[in-house]
Amino acid sequence: MNKNIKYSQNFLTSEKVLNQIIKQLNLKETDTVYEIGTGKGHLTTKLAKISKQVTSIELDSHLFNLSSEKLKLNIRVTLIHQDILQFQFPNKQRYKIVGNIPYHLSTQIIKKVVFESHASDIYLIVEEGFYKRTLDIHRTLGLLLHTQVSIQQLLKLPAECFHPKPKVNSVLIKLTRHTTDVPDKYWKLYTYFVSKWVNREYRQLFTKNQFHQAMKHAKVNNLSTVTYEQVLSIFNSYLLFNGRK
C-alpha cells in the first residue's frame, strides 16, 4: 500500500462483500451517484454497472491516477481529484451519495453530506462505534443530524472485510432525508440551544420556572432518558419563552 495516501483508508476488495453492499443500496438505472473516495475503483465499477452516472471524488493523487487508468473507458464514470470537504454538491439535481469514508474524518464528512448536500439518500461505511454515536441524542452530533435525516444500519462489516485490517468493525448505514424538524430561521438558535443542552447548562437557556414548565410540557420525568422528540419540545418552549414564536 502506498504510504503517501492522504487519508488513511481501509479498502474493500472482496467481491462477495462488495456485492452485498450493492444489493443494500437499492440503486436504479436512473440514479445519479456521488461517491466519496474512489480508492482503487472496486466499488465505483459496481456502482456504474447499475447507475446512470457516477461522479467519484478522490483526494489522493496515487489512488486518483490508479483509478483513472482503470476506469478511463467507462463512460458512466467521472473522476474528480479533490478533497471531499471542499467539494460542492449540486443544488438542484437529484442524486444519492455513497462512501467508504476514513474513520478519523467521519464527523466532518457526515456533517458535509447532511448539511451541505441535497442528496435524498446517503450510504456510508463507518466505524461501528461512530454509528452508535450518531444515534445518541445526548451528544451534539446526534441532535443535529436527527433534524435532517433518519439513520439506520443496513449491514455489519467485520474488520476482516477490509485491507489493511482495521482494529474495529464497520457498518453500512443509510441516512434518509426527511422534512427538516428545525426551519432555517431557527437553525442558529437550535445549534446554540444544543451546545448548552448537551453540557447541561440549563441556566443559560431557562429561568428555574421556565425550565420546570418546559419539562412538564415535554412530559420529561427523567433527563437521562429524554427522547429526541422531547428535546424538540423543550427547544420549542425555549423559542416561546424568548419571544421567537
Curated annotation (Swiss-Prot):
UniProt-annotated binding residues for S-adenosyl-L-methionine: 10, 12, 37, 58, 83, 100
Catalytic activity, as annotated: adenosine(2085) in 23S rRNA + 2 S-adenosyl-L-methionine = N(6)-dimethyladenosine(2085) in 23S rRNA + 2 S-adenosyl-L-homocysteine + 2 H(+)
Gene Ontology terms: cellular component: cytosol
A Pfam family the protein falls into: RrnaAD
PROSITE patterns: RRNA_A_DIMETH, SAM_RNA_A_N6_MT
GO BP terms, alphabetized: response to antibiotic
EC number: 2.1.1.184
Major enzyme class: transferase
Gene3D superfamilies: Ribosomal RNA adenine dimethylase-like, domain 2, Vaccinia Virus protein VP39
Keywords in alphabetical order: Antibiotic resistance, Methyltransferase, Plasmid, RNA-binding, S-adenosyl-L-methionine, Transferase, Transposable element
Lineage top rank: taxon: Bacteria
SMART domains the UniProt entry points to: rADc
UniProt GO MF annotations: 23S rRNA (adenine(2085)-N(6))-dimethyltransferase activity; RNA binding; rRNA (adenine-N6,N6-)-dimethyltransferase activity
Alphabetized CDD domains for the sequence: AdoMet_MTases (cd02440)
Family: Belongs to the class I-like SAM-binding methyltransferase superfamily. rRNA adenine N(6)-methyltransferase family.
Job description of the protein: This protein produces a dimethylation of the adenine residue at position 2085 in 23S rRNA, resulting in reduced affinity between ribosomes and macrolide-lincosamide-streptogramin B antibiotics.
Protein name: rRNA adenine N-6-methyltransferase
Organism listed in the record: Enterococcus faecalis (strain ATCC 700802 / V583)
Lineage: Bacteria, Bacillati, Bacillota, Bacilli, Lactobacillales
